[in-house]
Design a protein with these regions (language model features):
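P-loop NTP-binding core
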Residues: 8-272
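Short, small-residue-biased leader/transition segments that mark boundaries at the very start
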Residues: 1-7
Length: 272
């Protein structure tokens, strides 16, 4: 893990601490990435932090997961990245208390091509988030399930990366490529970037496989691993279809409790 794990954001010259920018990333789909982005954001907001969630996935799952009609919004991250909309007209305020959202929809899939000819295209999102770090304690980036220019933008803007890993047989598939990409971005584009940690998702205590995956990852992955493990939970799976994070949809469910514990761990890492 090395000395980079000790890097801290410095207060800007006015003395106010800048918000942390956490990219939730894994190019493997179906690992609970959007679920983690939604519910970590909501549980940090529940604890009184001012949070901005940015949906960087053209599928728009984080957008709809907060009850926003992704097909009925005029301004999204796509328009913001291309300079076709103002930030104030793009941010959806208070999707839940203390939590704002920059939404996305399928239009964002065209950004990859349209950004190609732009100078310093890797830094476009950073230019946006750097202006927002004084307003929010946390900015959570839900990355697309691929290592494309949108993900590179997220890693260039982020202060740290959180990687959800599903407790399934192919859990480590592609992870070495993601970590290599993170290392390259840190070396060439974003010196402050660090590994926030790995969080296990969709854990099923009834199966030996889940336990084996956890043990295998711990043995083979030289990264911070969160103590909190997110269980496979029916209520957690239902919540997005109702447009609510789990702590609102079913506050007493195992899914809600686990994401509250994850939020506590994230907060504790800020204090250490």
């Amino acid at each position: 893990m090395g000395s980079e794990m000790c890097i801290r954001d410095r207060p800007h010259k006015g003395g106010m601490k800048l918000g942390r920018i956490i990219a939730v990333a894994n190019q493997k789909g179906g690992v609970g990435k959007s679920t983690t982005a939604i519910n970590l954001s909501a549980c940090l907001a529940e604890k009184g932090k001012k949070v901005l969630a940015i949906d960087m996935d053209p599928q728009g799952n984080t957008t709809s997961g907060f009850g926003v009609d992704k097909n009925g919004i005029e301004n999204t991250l796509y328009e913001l990245l291309l300079g076709e909309a103002e930030m104030k007209d793009t941010i959806v305020k208070d999707v839940v208390e203390n939590l704002d959202l920059i939404p996305s929809n399928i239009n964002l899939s065209g950004a990859e091509i349209e950004l190609v000819g732009i100078d310093d295209k890797e830094f476009i999102l950073k230019g946006i988030t750097d202006k927002l770090r004084r307003k929010y304690d946390y900015i959570i980036l839900d990355c697309p399930p691929s290592l494309n220019m949108l993900t590179i933008n997220a890693l260039t803007a982020a202060t740290s990366v959180l990687v959800p890993i599903q407790c399934e047989y192919y859990a480590l598939e592609g992870l070495s490529q993601l970590i290599h990409t993170i290392d390259l971005v840190k070396e060439r584009l974003n010196k402050r970037l660090k590994m926030e940690g790995v969080v296990f998702t969709m854990y099923d205590a009834r199966t030996n496989l889940s336990l084996q995956v956890v043990e295998n990852v711990k043995e083979n992955l030289n990264q911070n691993i969160y103590k909190t493990i997110i269980p496979r939970n029916v209520r957690l799976a239902e919540a997005p279809s109702y447009g609510q994070p789990i702590n609102i949809y079913d506050p007493r469910s195992a899914g809600a409790e686990s994401y509250r514990l994850l939020a506590e761990e994230v907060l504790n890492r800020e204090d250490n």
